[in-house]
Amino acid sequence: MEKNKSTAIEIAESSKESKGKAPLLAAAVGHDRAAGYKRGVSIFDLFLRISAATAALAATIVMGTTEQTLPFFTQFFQFRAQYDDLPTFTFFVVGMAIVTGYLILSVPFSIVCIARPVAIGPRFLLIVGDTLKAVLATSAAGSSAAIVYLAHNGNSDANWLDICQQFNDFCQRVSGAVVAAFVAVVLLIFLIVLSAMALRKN
């Protein structure tokens, strides 16, 4: 009888210990799963960030090197079109250069988020910076898109002639730069959404 009682007591203690360890084990598994999810988001963030930087850099270089001179000229005039003839395109180059610089400098923060997926500080800085630069890129791309539209179609009410019939290469390059800028804007929006998803998991 004493042996049976002793055996019963040992089983009860073992059961009690396992009940105490079960919540801790479940919490650890949940923490690892959340960290793995955030690490996956951070890796995708890094890929999109590099892609956005590439698009913004391409837009800056293409617009900043856009120039066309027509093969005919007069004694007093030479027909040439450059991006800096229009203040809107100058703003585009400066704005997209700032966006490019920010995206390149933000890559180390994205890498930190991969190494430390549960860290909130770097992710919060990224979402603030991405939002500000998305606004800048949108304003640069949107204002330049309006000028490109006028260059292609003109405005008969204001007697603004379309110049793309004469400066075809110029218009193609500035149009390509604006398209690349909008690609960067879309990628920045995706980056903001990813950062919001990662912060929401906290």
Curated annotation (Swiss-Prot):
<keyword id="KW-0812">Transmembrane</keyword>
<dbReference type="Pfam" id="PF04535">
    <property type="entry name" value="CASP_dom"/>
</dbReference>
<comment type="function">
    <text>Regulates membrane-cell wall junctions and localized cell wall deposition. Required for establishment of the Casparian strip membrane domain (CSD) and the subsequent formation of Casparian strips, a cell wall modification of the root endodermis that determines an apoplastic barrier between the intraorganismal apoplasm and the extraorganismal apoplasm and prevents lateral diffusion.</text>
</comment>
<keyword id="KW-0472">Membrane</keyword>
<feature type="topological domain" description="Extracellular">
    <location>
        <begin position="152"/>
        <end position="173"/>
    </location>
</feature>
<dbReference type="GO" id="GO:0071555">
    <property type="term" value="P:cell wall organization"/>
</dbReference>
<feature type="topological domain" description="Cytoplasmic">
    <location>
        <begin position="112"/>
        <end position="130"/>
    </location>
</feature>
<keyword id="KW-1133">Transmembrane helix</keyword>
<dbReference type="InterPro" id="IPR044173">
    <property type="entry name" value="CASPL"/>
</dbReference>
<comment type="similarity">
    <text>Belongs to the Casparian strip membrane proteins (CASP) family.</text>
</comment>
<feature type="topological domain" description="Cytoplasmic">
    <location>
        <begin position="195"/>
        <end position="202"/>
    </location>
</feature>
<feature type="transmembrane region" description="Helical">
    <location>
        <begin position="43"/>
        <end position="63"/>
    </location>
</feature>
<protein>
    <recommendedName>
        <fullName>Casparian strip membrane protein 1</fullName>
    </recommendedName>
</protein>
<keyword id="KW-0961">Cell wall biogenesis/degradation</keyword>
<feature type="topological domain" description="Cytoplasmic">
    <location>
        <begin position="1"/>
        <end position="42"/>
    </location>
</feature>
<dbReference type="InterPro" id="IPR006459">
    <property type="entry name" value="CASP/CASPL"/>
</dbReference>
<dbReference type="InterPro" id="IPR006702">
    <property type="entry name" value="CASP_dom"/>
</dbReference>
<dbReference type="GO" id="GO:0005886">
    <property type="term" value="C:plasma membrane"/>
</dbReference>
<feature type="transmembrane region" description="Helical">
    <location>
        <begin position="91"/>
        <end position="111"/>
    </location>
</feature>
<comment type="subunit">
    <text>Homodimer and heterodimers.</text>
</comment>
<feature type="transmembrane region" description="Helical">
    <location>
        <begin position="131"/>
        <end position="151"/>
    </location>
</feature>
<feature type="transmembrane region" description="Helical">
    <location>
        <begin position="174"/>
        <end position="194"/>
    </location>
</feature>
<keyword id="KW-1003">Cell membrane</keyword>
<feature type="topological domain" description="Extracellular">
    <location>
        <begin position="64"/>
        <end position="90"/>
    </location>
</feature>
